[in-house]
Amino acid sequence: MEGFWNSKSIIRITLSFIFLFICHFLDVLAAPTRNLCRPEQRDALLAFKNEFEIGKPSPDHCKIYGIESPRKTDSWGNNSDCCNWEGVTCNAKSGEVIELDLSCSSLHGRFHSNSSIRNLHFLTTLDLSFNDFKGQITSSIENLSHLTYLDLSSNHFSGQILNSIGNLSRLTYLNLFDNQFSGQAPSSICNLSHLTFLDLSYNRFFGQFPSSIGGLSHLTTLSLFSNKFSGQIPSSIGNLSNLTTLDLSNNNFSGQIPSFIGNLSQLTFLGLFSNNFVGEIPSSFGNLNQLTRLYVDDNKLSGNFPNVLLNLTGLSLLSLSNNKFTGTLPPNITSLSNLMDFDASDNAFTGTFPSFLFTIPSLTYIRLNGNQLKGTLEFGNISSPSNLYELDIGNNNFIGPIPSSISKLVKLFRLDISHLNTQGPVDFSIFSHLKSLLDLNISHLNTTTRIDLNYFLSYFKRLLLLDLSGNHVSATNKSSVSDPPSQLIQSLYLSGCGITEFPEFVRTQHELGFLDISNNKIKGQVPDWLWRLPILYYVNLSNNTLIGFQRPSKPEPSLLYLLGSNNNFIGKIPSFICGLRSLNTLDLSDNNFNGSIPRCMGHLKSTLSVLNLRQNHLSGGLPKQIFEILRSLDVGHNQLVGKLPRSLSFFSTLEVLNVESNRINDTFPFWLSSLPKLQVLVLRSNAFHGPIHEATFPELRIIDISHNRFNGTLPTEYFVKWSAMSSLGKNEDQSNEKYMGSGLYYQDSMVLMNKGVAMELVRILTIYTAVDFSGNRFEGEIPKSIGLLKELLVLSLSNNAFSGHMPSSMGNLTALESLDVSKNKLTGEIPQELGDLSFLAYMNFSHNQLAGLVPGGQQFLTQNCSAFEDNLGLFGSSLEEVCRDIHTPASHQQFETPETEEEDEDLISWIAAAIGFGPGIAFGLMFGYILVSYKPEWFMNPFDRNNRRQKRHKTTH
């Protein structure tokens, strides 16, 4: 009975609890909903949202990175729980906002130091990536001391990162990728001892990276890609034993690749490309057993193929391109059984084609173009079908036929066998099996076979890029194929193909963006339909015999580059060009255009970056208000008059200004010194006049103001502020060839006097420096400040009236290759310091009043004797050496000392007197005999007249 009662009691109690729970639950449901979000947190979030503009969503941009919900702040409102807002995470107990993810939310605006985000004190995660924030990282963020995760990537933050970022001592993740931060990376970053991820890539940091980076022992990812860090890699990086990703690519790091990188045995990714590394790859790299991707391309590495890399059997990608590697590729590279992508292009590898590469089953990309491989192109046994997607072996020294086994590479989407010396006919049907090709380069095959373009294109259904340059292409508007090609080409290269008419099939290529038909024999007019291709952005018509343009009804606005130089275009510049509203580069140089520069080109003022109209017959003045973002303006060799428009001083992007060989009549444009990027200034052969006042040209590398009427003296400190010519070598690696221009599609060119001859610079190296003041009326002394231009290569001051001594500071011009001070009034000695200038290959001191010992440097011994002529006081062994084959008396007199010269002059005077004395006596005796004997009337009458005057005078007195 007792047990029963106990069981009954338990049941009753249990039912009572259930009843009470249900009642409580119903009360809860009936009660108003409690907000987890704290009011001050909600207010801070709303205030932060209102600090910025919210733009249109950009889902495509964000989807690339897996972000599917842009404009997260659209869900934010005053009457809802902020903890339920998209992108907001709260602490479940306290209601404090601890995570804020506003990535890809279309937020625009500048961060302020008093931003409301500072009130979210307990934030541990802040993700503001993929927006349009501007300004500096302010204390509003740097004081969020609880942060462990901070992502500001892909914005427009700028300025320096303050040392106070070191206050975020709990950070484990810091991503500043793709902003505009500048200055030196603060050493305080290295105080963030818990960091596992640090990405500073795609910014503008410079200088040496802090050596204290080695203290971040937990770091697994370090990316400094695409900045301007310089110097050697900090040795402390060798202490980061947990690193799996190290990317130092696209900086200015120099020296040898340090061996301590081989200590980072956990690395799976190593990027060192696009720096200034020299020497060989360290043997310690053999320790990187976990490495799967290695980039060392675009450096100055040398030596044979680094066999130490053959130990890295896990490599899937190996990029060695654009270095100075030599020797042959080793057959045991096949030990890299996981290799998928192998790039050894643009080196100096020799030997025959390494067909053993085809035995690596995983290999899908082979790039060996731009080496010195030679012999017959043989592929050996190719598995069928091959897995190869890309084969680039062009621009080598291969000879012979195209291997028939190429037809087995059926998965190829890119093939480059350009510059293969086939030495005979080619059966182009061999390519008909490569149905997957998207990109085909068979330019310059040295074949006698003519290509029927329409027939050739019928082989392909997917082809997007075709390069047939340098081959013989048949009449493109006549074909044995009845139907036009069905595929839509995007890029077509037909340069130097002997074409005489516009390829008609282009008319139907509505996907065509790039067209190069330069260096042909195309005559007549450019068809109007060309400008109606909807996405055409590049057209190169240069070096043909075209005479004009058919006027299009309405050109498409897509064109960016129009290159039409060296044709026979006549008449005025066609006005339809003004309708190409996206035009960036216009080159119509070396034609026969006349008239003035069209004022309607003002429609292009916000897009036109390059305008080249040199070598035409243009007249009138330069338009005043048509260009805003010009980078390069070349109107040389025309008939332009008037003055330089002062509006040029507002073109802050201008780098090149060339107005040579016109009729411009103006004073020196000192006001151009306000242009922060001006690098080339050419005023040669105009009617400029007057003094040239002191001006600051911080970026100027080439100045040619020769053959004008400038006069006056040059101020002593004239060259003091020409910093690019004095410090260029400190900021740039001179062996790294970079050219002025717009990259792949256009590069600036000019003609400059160098070493006494006109030299055409088809491309202008950014490290090339020259000063040409010749052919003016300058006087006074050459400024001593000329010696500050330590990177100067060419200096010409000839044909002026400079006087006084040549400054000894010229000996500081250690890079000088050409010096011309001829035809002035210089006195004194040639500075002995010039004898130490080892690069000085050409010099001209002629037609001055120089005297004294000629310097004895080796470069002086290689000069022509004419370089010293008409300087009667020069002497020395160097002069005797270079003039020893000259035997004229004037030449010998030139070498003698002043004392010897004086003695010789006296002797010559006596000899001349003696020579004249003998004939004089003989002539006098003969003349006297005639007078006495014959008394000629013409001689005696004057004496009679005198006698009569005397008699008359006496009679009157």
Swiss-Prot record:
Question: Sorted alphabetically, which keywords does the UniProt record give?
Answer: Cell membrane, Glycoprotein, Leucine-rich repeat, Membrane, Receptor, Repeat, Signal, Transmembrane, Transmembrane helix
User: Where is it mostly found?
Assistant: membrane
Q: Which domain of life is it from?
A: Eukaryota
Point out the glycosylated residues in this chain: 78, 114, 143, 167, 191, 239, 242, 252, 263, 311, 332, 381, 441, 446, 477, 540, 543, 594, 665, 711, 812, 844, 864
Localization in the cell? Cell membrane
Establish whether keyword DNA damage is in the entry: no
Instruction: List the SMART domains hit by this protein, alphabetically.
Output: LRR_SD22, LRR_TYP
| Side Cytoplasmic, residues | 932-957
Q: Which InterPro entries match?
A: Leu-rich_rpt (IPR001611), Leu-rich_rpt_typical-subtyp (IPR003591), LRR_dom_sf (IPR032675), LRR_N_plant-typ (IPR013210), LRR_R13L4/SHOC2-like (IPR055414)
Signal peptide (from-to): 1-30
| Extracellular-side segments | 31-910
Topology versus the membrane, per the UniProt entry?
Single-pass type I membrane protein
In which ranges do the LRR repeats occur? 120-143, 144-170, 172-192, 193-216, 217-240, 241-266, 268-287, 288-312, 313-336, 338-360, 361-384, 386-409, 412-433, 434-458, 460-483, 486-509, 510-533, 535-556, 558-580, 581-604, 605-629, 631-651, 652-674, 675-697, 698-721, 765-789, 790-813, 814-837, 839-862
Transmembrane regions: 911-931
Which SUPFAM superfamilies does the record cross-reference, listed alphabetically? L domain-like, RNI-like
* One Gene Ontology CC term in the entry: plasma membrane
Pfam families with a match to the protein in the record: LRR_1 (PF00560), LRR_14 (PF23598), LRR_8 (PF13855), LRRNT_2 (PF08263)
Q: Which family does it belong to?
A: Belongs to the RLP family.
What is the official name of this protein in its record?
A: Receptor-like protein 53
What are the leading ranks of the lineage?
Eukaryota, Viridiplantae, Streptophyta, Embryophyta, Tracheophyta
User: Coding gene?
Assistant: RLP53
